[in-house]
From Swiss-Prot:
It is found in: Cell membrane. It is an enzyme of class 7 (translocase). It comes from Oceanobacillus iheyensis (strain DSM 14371 / CIP 107618 / JCM 11309 / KCTC 3954 / HTE831). SMART domains: AAA. GO terms for cellular component: plasma membrane. Its EC number is 7.3.2.2. PANTHER family: AMINO ACID IMPORT ATP-BINDING PROTEIN, PHOSPHONATES IMPORT ATP-BINDING PROTEIN PHNC. This is Phosphonates import ATP-binding protein PhnC 1. It is a peripheral membrane protein. Pfam families: ABC_tran. GO terms for molecular function: ABC-type phosphonate transporter activity; ATP binding; ATP hydrolysis activity. Part of the ABC transporter complex PhnCDE involved in phosphonates import. Responsible for energy coupling to the transport system. Coiled coil: none annotated.
Length: 258
């Protein structure tokens, strides 16, 4: 379980990234965070694995306040927290398989990974992860030879290989076209259901949030302004979250692939 207790974050320049956040996320949930650019979505999600560090409050994960973590405890937190980025965050010159095996770094250690001394179980897990996102045929292609959608599937496979307890996806479809966006979200939802991995996704597109989320958290100016099940969300809810009427560019569009 993840719980924010009166969490605030002030950047060195004085900007408030988070303001008095009180949110509890239960194990196995699929939560979508929505809000305009600058609303605090990325700050919220990156605080969970301490890519940014809140300055006030407590952030409780599995009954421990992670804001006190350093050294080995912080490394262990990041090992059980898989991260998916908008820009894929792959090693472009390495092949797909090496990128996916990198998901085992937290379990294997730097020296063994440098010399590609992965256990047979790790190699088998990487193969399985590639098959689960239907990208195994590109296993020996360099990452920079792939399309954006293919690269994002590789990043999902890498996270699967990490075997995390939590998946954090920071605007994972922002750079993709509508059909590919739906494909990526479908994989994330499928993994959430099959593996019971708590999944938190930042999205701008409200139609995708409605289609894939179990629960929606709305943010504006660093504050949570809505938190509830998707069944309670309407267009007026999004207008309240965004502080304006809904525009065409707030919708991703495109049909979900069958």
């Amino acid at each position: 379980m993840i719980e924010f207790k009166d969490v605030g974050l002030v950047y060195p320049n004085g900007t408030e990234g988070l303001k008095n956040i009180n949110v509890k996320i239960n194990d196995g949930e699929f939560v979508v965070i929505v809000g305009l650019s600058g609303a605090g979505k990325s700050t919220f999600i990156r605080s969970i694995n301490r890519l940014v560090t809140p300055t006030t409050g407590e952030l409780i994960i599995d009954d421990e306040n992670i804001l006190n973590y350093s050294g080995n405890k912080l490394r262990m937190l990041r090992t059980k927290t898989g991260m998916i980025f908008q820009n894929y965050n792959l090693v472009k010159r390495s092949n797909v398989f090496k990128n996916v095996l990198a998901g085992r770094l937290g379990h294997t250690g730097t020296i063994r990974s440098i010399f590609n001394q992965y256990k047979k179980e790790d190699v088998a897990l990487a193969y399985e992860s590639l098959h689960r996102v239907n990208i195994a045929e590109k296993i020996y292609n360099r990452a920079d030879e792939l399309s954006g959608g293919q690269q994002q599937r590789v990043s999902i496979a890498r996270v699967l290989t990490q075997q995390p307890k939590y998946i954090l996806a920071d605007e994972p479809v922002a750079s993709l076209d509508p059909p590919t966006s739906h494909q990526v979200m479908t994989y994330l939802k499928k993994i959430n259901r099959e593996d019971k991995i708590t999944t938190i996704v930042n999205l701008h597109f409200i139609d995708m949030a409605m289609e894939y989320a179990d629960r929606i958290i709305g943010m504006r100016a660093g504050e949570v302004v809505f938190d509830g099940p998707v069944s309670e969300v309407s267009e007026s809810t999004f207008e309240e979250i965004y502080g304006r009427s809904i525009r065409e560019d707030d919708l991703r569009g495109g049909a979900k692939e069958s």
